[in-house]
Amino acid sequence: GKLLNSNNYLVYCGGGEGVMEAIAKGVSHDGGTCVGILKGISTDEMNQYIDIPIATNMGITRNALLAYSCDASVAISGNYGTLSEIAYALQLNKTVIGIETWDIDGVQNMDSEAKVIQKLNRMFK
């Protein structure tokens, strides 16, 4: 999150706990902006570091909104929710970069956050 923020990226995530909260916390560290695409109808489920909450009431199908909203996707570890985010992004021909995540065709796995930022910067700057 800190690296994304220090490189001036607007960050979208699911807005919940775990990796989503860690990313949002890092983004907010120096005043960055993190958008949370939430599963429920209220903001009660979001973590405290989300700047712009979007309550969808869509459950896990909100992962499609995440994929549509982003220019690229970074998947960090994760379970089936992360897998569905990866699948949506790949179906939309978005770049998917992974760190210790699903090993499937189309995911560009990196072994460090610094390499992820280098890849994003080559793509967008």
Feature-to-residue mapping (PLM):
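A short beta-strand-loop structural module common to alpha/beta enzyme folds
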Residues: 10-17
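Acidic/glycine-enriched connector segments
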Residues: 17-88, 100
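Short acidic-hydrophobic, aromatic-tinged amphipathic segments that line or gate anion-handling sites
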Residues: 53-57, 97, 107-122
